[in-house]
């Protein structure tokens, strides 16, 4: 998977949004110190570089490492100082990191949250200090102090994931068209979804199910475990270990310990896929 290429475009957009937000808030450009945007791209009024805090959820996924580095590189190329932190999928760690970014003088925050509802205190502090906040990929909910949201069309991403499963099962071509010589079924599959506290996860799942449902309805595909709702298949924090435990339980309870056929598994994330495998 070309992680950098796929997600790098969104990282570039986030860097552009950050630069634009700084300009709109009066943090960038020429200040009392006499620096101009042509000199550094982001000179603060005291002559120093403007600092941007970038909070990413984890380094256990190549995707988040690539995204964090891409945002950092884009902002540094524009002349900003960047404090990039990864939180190891631990909510208290991320809240502490964001608190520290604010204390250290960050003038804008780019946040890919672990839990989009767990940052109220940090967001309120940012709002009181007029620090713009960009929610990166994962929506931060229930707080008015989020200024921008940068993400994909996550339903369409889910459609692509569902189509990838159909293609892998030999039911469609790479463009999603039914094949005349496709297997008749029934083919056993199981479903996995992302974290229930991540707004994106439900969109991924709904998008995938929109293309899988016709095959489930006509019996070509069968979810043998019967676990077909988002709540039944969601993996908290997108964690590989949680996905592995669920897959092991499914194989034991539904597939005779692995002796019965399982044709494919829907997975929305590389880390979950590694746990499944």
Locate the predicted segments by residue.
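A residue-level marker of the well-folded mature domains of exported/periplasmic proteins
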Residues: 2-12, 22, 27-277
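Alpha-helical transmembrane segments
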Residues: 17-21
